[in-house]
Amino acid sequence: MTESERKQIIALIQREVIPAIGCTEPIAVALCVAKATETLGAKPEKIKVLLSANILKNAMGVGIPGTGMIGLPIAVALGALIGKSDYQLEVLKDSTPEAVEEGKKLIDEKRICISLKEDITEKLYIEVTCEAGGEQATAIISGGHTTFVYVAKGDEVLLNKQQTSGEEEKEETLELTLRKVYDFALTAPLDEIRFILETARLNKKAAEQSFQGDYGHALGKMLRGTYEHKIMGDSVFSHILSYTSAACDARMAGAMIPVMSNSGSGNQGISATLPVVVYAEENGKSEEELIRALMMSHLTVIYIKQSLGRLSALCGCVVAATGSSCGITWLMGGSYKQVAFAVQNMIANLTGMICDGAKPSCALKVTTGVSTAVLSAVMAMENRCVTSVEGIIDEDVDQSIRNLTRIGSQGMNETDRVVLDIMTHKGC
């Protein structure tokens, strides 16, 4: 691997693994509102928001940090009132109870209009227009949760990258394979990849805060209680499940707790991190081993998401747990061959799990994903692998990954449409 390629990979990871407070879809909407408000230069009197179906789906049932409320309207209101676009996915970190009350007034006065953007192919699209004093400003995010492609005030266009995105082009030229991911994680100079330890610090802290509270369905807290001893035993496996689900519980309930995200998703960041951290800590692994295992996990997720896309009908925990399965397999002493076996086992098991939006019950899916990650790693260490005569698995692990992402990005499009239709017509 050349030094240039190594630096490209590090830059890619630093773009994709970033802190986030709250579910990234409503937070990305708040970020877009903040940018439009800043461009307008005044408190908006009216805010019009147009969203792709996938953004709408992921923002309907999730808690907004620091508000005790669910859904988009309060995220939009706070983006206008206290949001700072420089904070990126921590855009709402300056929220106060007073701002929440003011935000409720904006909602009650019907100053916020949220609609589906028709006739677009983008799965991640946010368009916000803010109006005040006869002036208006527009901001558009597309392709990535923090990727602004258009900003304008009145007739003055300040940014227009709608045709081409240099950042996306750079990512496309970096062609990853599982072998390349594995080699990078094991050979990159330690000081160049030490930053990945921040994922362990932030995401473990989120889980520990969740154990102290009562968030969402409190699955993590429940698993850590009497059930852990009575049913699963006080084991590494049970701790992996409780820590991972606890962090997800807090996040989906809207706790004001930052987590380290991966590819625009906090739950993916949690699922790629905590199983690896818990396994490493409870098995006495060194700091270097933890760093390399975390890097393998997170870069595997980024690699798979390159062909899947940021949002799809496929639950993101399938991808993120595949990353953690790789990290755990390597920590168990696995070779590249066994890491590849773990990936094949994951794809054979979890492909097809639907995404029906971000919400507290995501903790259940995350727990399913990481329990399968451990199972897949154990099978791999016994040199057991789902074979190419079975279902969608190919002899070549990278082709199996492409089969997974093809199902998620193409095959499940109708599933996505039906899921959103069901979600938007409940009780009708």
Curated annotation (Swiss-Prot):
Q: Which InterPro entries match?
A: Ser_deHydtase-like_asu, UPF0597
Per the record, the GO terms for biological process are: L-cysteine catabolic process to pyruvate
Signal peptide residue numbers: none
Pfam families cross-referenced by the UniProt entry: SDH_alpha
Q: Name one GO molecular function term.
A: L-cysteine desulfhydrase activity
Membership in a protein family: Belongs to the UPF0597 family.
Instruction: Report the protein name in the record.
Output: UPF0597 protein BF3560
